Each structure stands twice: as C-alpha cells, then as structure tokens.
C-alpha cells in the first residue's frame, strides 16, 4: 500500500480532503501527503509510532515530542507540535479523504484505485479551455486588465497579457493554462460560506453550480451548501435575493517564469538565504515566509504558512508607470541576454500605480526620497549563489 495519492493536475484545490483528514496527513497547493513509507516509525525512539500490518499506529502516551518523525518524513507532511495528539501527518487509512473528494481523484493504491481523469494541457502561450464557467474570478486578479467576460467565457487580450499566470493559478475550475504547463495553484481558504433566511428556495444556486455541489431539500425548504468547494462565487453572483455569502482568502500568487531567474517549487524548503542575500535589501525583490513563520528579509514573526514571492520581471510595473521611472532593461549572463527591471528614482512621483499592479506584491513605496521604491529585480543572481550553498538549487538561470 502506498498511502494517499492525489491526481494533482485535476485537483480543484477545494480542500475537502484536507478538511476531512483527522490526522492532517494532506496539504494542498503545494501538495503533500503521507505515502506510508514508515520512515517516521523507524525514526521514533520510544515506539509511539509503529508499523503494524501495513498501518501506522500512534500512541500519544509514548510520544516525547522529539520531532524525529518529522525530520525523517520524506514528503514533509509529518509534524510535531504542542496540540494533542502532538504527532500529526500520518495516514491511518480511514479513507475519509477519498469519500470527501467531490471529483473522485484520490486513491489509496492497493486499497482504493480511482481511474485517472484525462487532462489535456493546451500547448499555446495562453489558453482558456471549455472548462471555463465564466465565474470571473480571473478578471480582478489580472494585473494588466487583460481579461474580460464575454458570452459567459473568459477572454484574454493577448496584446495586454504579460503571461504572469496569476489567472491560471487562481481559476477555480482549472480552465486557464499558460505556456503549455499545469498551473501551480494558489492556496485558498473559505473563511465563510452561508445562506440566510432570505433564501426563497428558487434553486438557482443549485442550477448554476458547475460541480453539482449544492443541494436543495424540498421537504425542509433548505439549501445545503458544501463544506468545501472550488469557490467560484457563481452561486453568490446568481442568487436573486442575495441570500448567499462566500468569503475566500487567497494565498500569494507563485512566481512562475520561463526564462531568466526561475524558482523550482519542488526543491525549495523555504530556508531564506536567497531573500537575505538579495543586494536590494531592504527592497525585498524576494519575500519569503519560512517554516517557522518568520518573514524574510524583514525577520518579523507571522502566523502564515511558508510562501515564496519574487519579482518575475513581467513588466506590469513598467507598462503602468506614467513617468518612465521604471523600464525594462537588459543584462547579459553566460552570453545570453535577459530582461531586468531598471528604476530611475529622479523620475518617480510615488504615485503607487506600479505597486497596485505587481502580481507578486513585492513592490512597495518607501517614503525615502533617495530610494522611493523597493521590490524590483535587477537579475544580479546573488540569490542563486545563496541558494546553491544550501545545496537545494531551488533557484536557477534559464
């Protein structure tokens, strides 16, 4: 048996599985699951974690919270904290994640094997597929206003598009693809999803839900909302009496680049030397929250999950700058010419328009006349050198 297997390219990031898991053995975007390799049991010095007939058994009374299990976990899902039962992140084969998944893409190989969904990734610079439901979630997140909704479908103006992929990362129904690749989805959390007494039982929300996740009980005249869903807001938008309220909090968009400085998410462990080394500090061309919740390079404590943001030199700020203070320059590395952001403080009027459109939220006004703007990358590659010293090689030149 091989633990929990999620078909990542089909996942809607609804988090139903992670909410259902009693031992926190699933994380979504980025994906981490327990594979039942039993490395944690082998590392446990007290027998609190043991393998028994292909299952992991945990005895909290024997746990000394040493953290050996978390250190040994190859996927990084195992964790130890002060919340009972202390050691978390191991699959107990309860199958609750399988039952919770609304699109049946979770398997437990050797026990429950679900057929993979066919996912065809368009090999075009940017493409909106037939999966688009016209929910418009992509429209407000586009930093250059390149997306509109026409005839209930998202339409992208390729003359404006900077291919930052924020739309693809945000799309609730996996309908947008950039550069022929599977998008690295943003984290999201439904903060509240409610229906009030104003509901008139018209069932419009049931009809428009693309995933058939909303039900209506005609006997009790009650609309039942799902505990977790892709959060496209169509139900809320179409309710004729505004009885549905959906509040969603998105994580930061991930830096996706095809050329120049490239971040390899699967290699990053959010350690931070790259952010600290960036010579524009405190201009923060790289922002990170490490595994301990420490924001770098500012070194301020947060309660956020690990994240990585960097200037991707997309040019949104350059396009928006009304004074010419920001422009796209060139730099040569290893005989190849790359784009980089160049800034002239004397031309900056501190209007903040560049800050508003930055898809990575790295640009900030400082109030310093000599250096009024921070957060742009000059492609010096000092971050790559710092990362290489950690032997992670999560940053590279491409």
Swiss-Prot record:
Pfam families: Fer4, Fer4_21, Fer4_7, Fer4_9. The gene is vhuB. The keyword Iron applies. CDD domains: MtMvhB_like. Residues 2-31, 25-53, 54-83, 82-111, 123-152, 152-181, 191-219, 220-249, 259-291, 300-331, 339-368 form the 4Fe-4S ferredoxin-type domain. One of its GO terms (molecular function) is oxidoreductase activity. SUPFAM superfamilies: 4Fe-4S ferredoxins. This is Polyferredoxin protein VhuB. [4Fe-4S] cluster binds at residues 11, 14, 17, 21, 34, 37, 40, 44, 63, 66, 69, 73, 91, 94, 97, 101, 132, 135, 138, 142, 161, 164, 167, 171, 199, 202, 205, 209, 229, 232, 235, 239, 268, 271, 274, 278, 311, 314, 317, 321, 348, 351, 354, 358, 377, 380, 383, 387. Keywords: 4Fe-4S, Electron transport, Iron, Iron-sulfur, Metal-binding, Repeat, Transport. InterPro entries: 4Fe4S_Fe-S-bd, 4Fe4S_Fe_S_CS, Fe-S_Ferredoxin. Its cofactor is [4Fe-4S] cluster. It comes from Methanococcus voltae. Binds 12 [4Fe-4S] clusters.
């Amino acid at each position: 048996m091989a633990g929990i297997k999620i078909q990542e390219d089909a996942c809607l990031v609804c988090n139903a599985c992670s909410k259902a898991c009693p031992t926190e053995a699933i994380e979504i975007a980025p994906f981490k699951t327990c594979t039942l390799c039993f490395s944690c049991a082998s590392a446990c010095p007290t027998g609190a974690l043991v393998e028994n007939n292909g299952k992991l058994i945990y005895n909290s009374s024997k746990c000394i919270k040493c953290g050996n299990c978390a250190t040994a976990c190859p996927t990084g899902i195992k964790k130890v904290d002060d919340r009972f039962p202390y050691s978390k992140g191991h699959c107990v084969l309860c199958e609750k994640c399988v039952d919770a998944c609304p699109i049946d893409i979770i398997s437990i190989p050797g026990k429950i094997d679900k057929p993979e969904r066919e996912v065809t990734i368009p090999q075009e610079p940017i493409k909106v597929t037939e999966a688009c439901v016209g929910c418009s979630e992509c429209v407000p997140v586009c930093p250059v206003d390149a997306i509109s909704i026409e005839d209930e479908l998202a339409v992208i103006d390729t003359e404006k598009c900077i291919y930052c992929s924020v739309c693809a990362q945000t799309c609730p129904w996996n309908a947008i693809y950039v550069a022929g690749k599977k998008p690295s989805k943003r984290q999201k959390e439904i903060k509240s999803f409610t229906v009030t007494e104003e509901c008139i039982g018209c069932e419009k929300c049931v009809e428009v839900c693309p995933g058939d996740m909303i039900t209506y009980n005609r006997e009790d005249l009650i609309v039942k909302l799902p505990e977790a869903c892709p959060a496209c807001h169509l139900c809320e938008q179409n309710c004729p009496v505004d009885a549905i309220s959906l509040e969603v909090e998105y994580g930061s968009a991930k830096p996706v680049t095809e050329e120049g400085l490239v971040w390899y998410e699967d290699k990053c462990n959010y350690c931070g030397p790259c952010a600290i080394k960036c010579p524009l500090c405190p201009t923060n061309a790289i922002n990170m929250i490490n595994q301990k919740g420490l924001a770098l390079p500012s070194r301020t404590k947060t309660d956020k999950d690990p994240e990585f943001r960097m200037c991707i030199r997309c040019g949104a700020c350059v396009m928006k700058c009304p004074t010419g203070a920001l422009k796209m320059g060139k730099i040569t590395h290893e005989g190849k010419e790359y784009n980089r952001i160049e800034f002239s403080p004397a031309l900056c009027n501190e209007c903040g328009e560049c800050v508003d459109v930055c898809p990575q939220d790295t640009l900030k006004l400082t109030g310093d006349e000599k250096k009024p703007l921070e957060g742009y990358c000059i492609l010096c590659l000092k971050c790559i050198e710092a990362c290489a010293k950690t032997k992670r090689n999560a940053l590279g030149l491409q």
